[in-house]
């Protein structure tokens, strides 16, 4: 498959995922709609991610053998540490989120993202729905590094996007290169009461 056709196929999968998120948001999607999307994603990953395909074949699962989305093999956590699991070339990924490495510091798990549009779309709706269903913005104090300090941290991305999209005046990051800004946190809390 050429790079152009891979890109076209990847863009179609992405568009369909974004449409699904837009359509269903935090509502329960019909089983048929979720099943169709999960199968589409699985078929794409099976075709373009050799290491995942090898794992699926060892489990005797192919796109043709699926009876429903629950047959799709989840990759064990160690797979993200030992394998390169991406359906597009690593060099074309906008972001690579990594685990903290607490169990194996020299062998951190990696999660590759061609771009962050789907990730961002899947984050903001649930955040608004579950954290702040009755308001547009809230004061947010982030006590961990911002995205600018930790480009490999999904939590850093999550909290940065939450603050950008939902934070009101007075929101901020209180963890900097020198560590936690205790005085800043104290001022933030004093203003909150």
Where are the predicted features?
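Extreme N-terminal, non-catalytic leader segments
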Residues: 50, 54-68
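Generic detector of short alpha-helix boundary/capping microenvironments
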Residues: 33, 48, 87-88
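Serine-centered coil/turn micro-motif
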Residues: 49-50, 153
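Alpha-helical scaffold segments that form or flank carboxylate-/histidine-based iron centers
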Residues: 32-42
